[in-house]
């Protein structure tokens, strides 16, 4: 069963982008390739339990098991040794990716306090979009009573678009609430 967003992409967005950017083939139309959710847990250096709760939160949000990220090199100022676990990340593709993107745009982002839209300047020049969230509470799956600490996360939406303009148009048509 294809998700609502995937169906909208194939039936409405692809023809619209083909006419707007004059693509000759349907394969030139940009698409969302993957979504990476990263949660850096700085306090995991001193308290290993905090990483477990972060991993649990991330698993509930993404619907799949996160990978623990480890420190690449030692930094004495942060009491950090090489190889210490300092965060977690999840890469979503396919069905889960569309489901998460749909949930993020239509349910989670509107729950952010004082939400007026997300910045349209956070593209990296190669058609990828990055957004930072300050708290995991905006996701409906996270229960307020169960969290030990408010944690933020980075969400990267990787598209096959060559330029930022194409990626912005793709995400706008998918329903990403950009600030006017």
UniProtKB/Swiss-Prot annotation:
Keyword annotations from UniProtKB, A to Z: Ribonucleoprotein, Ribosomal protein, RNA-binding, rRNA-binding, tRNA-binding
Biological process (GO), any one: translation
PROSITE patterns: RIBOSOMAL_L5
InterPro entries xref list: Ribosomal_uL5, Ribosomal_uL5_bac-type, Ribosomal_uL5_C, Ribosomal_uL5_CS, Ribosomal_uL5_dom_sf, Ribosomal_uL5_N
Superkingdom: Bacteria
One cellular component (GO) term of this entry: ribosome
Pfam family of the protein (one): Ribosomal_L5
Listed Gene3D superfamilies: 3.30.1440.10
Molecular function terms, GO-annotated: rRNA binding; structural constituent of ribosome; tRNA binding
Family: Belongs to the universal ribosomal protein uL5 family.
Subunit structure: Part of the 50S ribosomal subunit; part of the 5S rRNA/L5/L18/L25 subcomplex. Contacts the 5S rRNA and the P site tRNA. Forms a bridge to the 30S subunit in the 70S ribosome.
Function: This is one of the proteins that bind and probably mediate the attachment of the 5S RNA into the large ribosomal subunit, where it forms part of the central protuberance. In the 70S ribosome it contacts protein S13 of the 30S subunit (bridge B1b), connecting the 2 subunits; this bridge is implicated in subunit movement. Contacts the P site tRNA; the 5S rRNA and some of its associated proteins might help stabilize positioning of ribosome-bound tRNAs.
Entry-linked NCBIfam families: PRK00010.1 (NF000585)
HAMAP family linked: Ribosomal_uL5_B (MF_01333_B)
Protein name from the UniProt record: Large ribosomal subunit protein uL5
């Amino acid at each position: 069963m294809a998700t609502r967003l995937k169906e909208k992409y194939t039936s409405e967005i692809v023809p619209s982008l083909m006419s707007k950017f004059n693509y000759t083939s349907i394969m030139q139309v940009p698409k969302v390739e993957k979504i990476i959710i990263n949660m850096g847990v700085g306090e995991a250096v001193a308290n290993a339990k905090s990483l477990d709760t972060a991993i649990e939160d991330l698993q509930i949000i993404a619907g799949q098991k996160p990978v623990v990220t480890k420190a690449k090199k030692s930094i004495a100022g942060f009491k950090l040794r090489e190889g210490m676990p300092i965060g977690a990340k999840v890469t979503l593709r396919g069905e889960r990716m569309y489901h998460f993107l749909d949930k993020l745009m239509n349910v989670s982002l509107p729950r952010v306090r004082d939400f007026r839209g997300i910045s349209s300047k956070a593209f990296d020049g190669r058609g990828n979009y990055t957004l930072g969230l300050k708290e995991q509470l905006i996701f409906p799956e996270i229960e307020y009573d169960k969290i030990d600490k408010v944690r933020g996360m980075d969400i990267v939406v990787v598209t096959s678009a060559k330029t930022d303009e194409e990626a912005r148009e793709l995400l706008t048509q998918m329903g990403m609430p950009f600030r006017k």
